[in-house]
């Protein structure tokens, strides 16, 4: 048989995808079943990590799975004499328009080892023929630096794909810090109209060295105009290397981009947590990466720098409280539980105690609170008890008018989603899981990785009044035992709770014996400032005998 085009072959192995042509999705039930995820809400199976094009009758599979296994499955559905396969090696890409030089050397052996792996040097030379690489480095170990070195050394036009536009801005600034690249050589692809102009040759942005883009931009354009247009975009830009930042996120979208840009020379999957929160999706993610060369350089003797402190207490929910917080699908509804906490006096005693300790010890702190309404209540509580901190507390969520400015504050209120993977919040001394329960290993490692300096602390408030939360705590213990410098668990019983409540009262009473120091110009008096800002209340020494809640 004479094959006129690559689409005539039954099975084609590309750089980041395996394509099965002229097939139906039902032709390979045992193969497809491995990528199925049961949707508890809609009660159906969704497929993750693969894609089927019904119009062209093409099945796209990840390149990282066993090629021979796929071959056998495909051959079993047809006459062996009719089976045909092809390995596509296009490797069409452009060089950077201007040579990019590094400004600094690797700072330690970890970065040197990661660079040797990414560039297939030394003992990693055997990977030279590979097209996909997984670089798994702990938060703060320099994933952006490694990507910059790879791009600089190879001199190939590249693209960085992240989940958020703000993280792209971090990449831009870090790459400019590490290299001598001109800012004009970095292009941030924003919106479908810009992609359309590039495809129509009406944009001056199609001849640069580095491109930055979010998953959502490519996903929206691919869903609207067809994923083949995304592949055409990469061809137009001459991209030879793509970097997926926090590769475990946006998993299905990453797979679709891999399938659409299947002939890009090399793909680097960069993350600190190479796994998925959902157990079924985690199995598929590991299958997706099964044969992708990877490196994980975590050293517990050196890299573990944050201590873990679990503070257990009992909010004493009534049976009706427990029932009201239930979710038929997931067991416990986080929003309902957090709303319950906002009405629970024991929680507020624990919060006042933890915040007073952090306030007195000094240092920057990040508080995880699961909902925006709860964040506003915690903010009001801080302002009520510590009015002098009016300019030191930031809200880092969608309700904030200036999220980036909020990251510079001394006390930051956020959610695990807002301050998720890839976020850079410098100089944190404390991370406090205050009112956002989770048991995901991925989220646990991400939140633990927010503090990057030595001698920092990760504090978790655990409500043992709900058995689900005790289960969450038990599920995460092994993570802290491995990745934290040390672990400590303390239980606050009723006598202890009364003691810390009294200790907090004394601290508040002593604070208001003297004029408060505000983060304002020295010539503004504290009292007049309080009145000017219309702060609800301040306790003075004569008013602390009866505490107002």
Q: Could you say what each language-model-derived stretch is?
A:
Residues 126-150:
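Walker A/P-loop
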Residues 146, 153-178, 371-375:
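Conserved Walker A/P-loop ATP-binding site and its immediately adjacent core
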Residues 167-193, 386-388:
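Conserved helix-turn-beta segment of the N-terminal RecA-like "Helicase ATP-binding" lobe
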Residues 205-224, 407-420:
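Conserved two-lobed SF2 helicase motor
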Residues 246-304:
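Post-DEXD/H (motif II) to motif III coupling segment of the RecA-like Helicase ATP-binding lobe
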Residues 289-299, 453-516:
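A conserved SF2-helicase RecA2
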Residues 294-363:
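Conserved interdomain linker/interface between the two RecA-like ATPase lobes of SF2 helicase motors
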Residues 398-479:
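Conserved RecA-like P-loop NTPase helicase motor core
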